[in-house]
Swiss-Prot record:
GO cellular component: cytosolic small ribosomal subunit
Gene3D superfamilies: 6.10.250.3130, S15/NS1, RNA-binding
Coiled-coil ranges (or none): none
Pfam families reported for this sequence: Ribosomal_S15 (PF00312)
Gene from which the chain derives: rpsO
SMART domains: Ribosomal_S15
Physiological role: One of the primary rRNA binding proteins, it binds directly to 16S rRNA where it helps nucleate assembly of the platform of the 30S subunit by binding and bridging several RNA helices of the 16S rRNA. Forms an intersubunit bridge (bridge B4) with the 23S rRNA of the 50S subunit in the ribosome.
Subunit structure comment from the entry: Part of the 30S ribosomal subunit. Forms a bridge to the 50S subunit in the 70S ribosome, contacting the 23S rRNA.
Native source species: Vibrio cholerae serotype O1 (strain ATCC 39315 / El Tor Inaba N16961)
Protein name: Small ribosomal subunit protein uS15
GO BP field: translation
HAMAP family per record: Ribosomal_uS15_B (MF_01343_B)
Amino acid sequence: MSLNAETKAAIVAEYARCENDTGSPEVQIALLTASINHLQGHFQAHKGDHHSRRGLLRMVSSRRKLLDYLKGKDLSRYQDLIKRLGLRR
């Protein structure tokens, strides 16, 4: 259910703030968003997979906390990220 290494590397390269950046909130949120989108397709085919649904809810919660942190830290970076990811906030 996880993303492969090439997909992760592409996401990190796109959202990184500098060359070796893998831990900034933008990168973490982008990786979580990709994983969430991947899992949503899984749940269309496997509606009864409640164990994975719990993992999905944990990812959504973690992304929400990171978004709240980024919003409080730097509003312009937050708004730019929301626009780039296509999130509805």
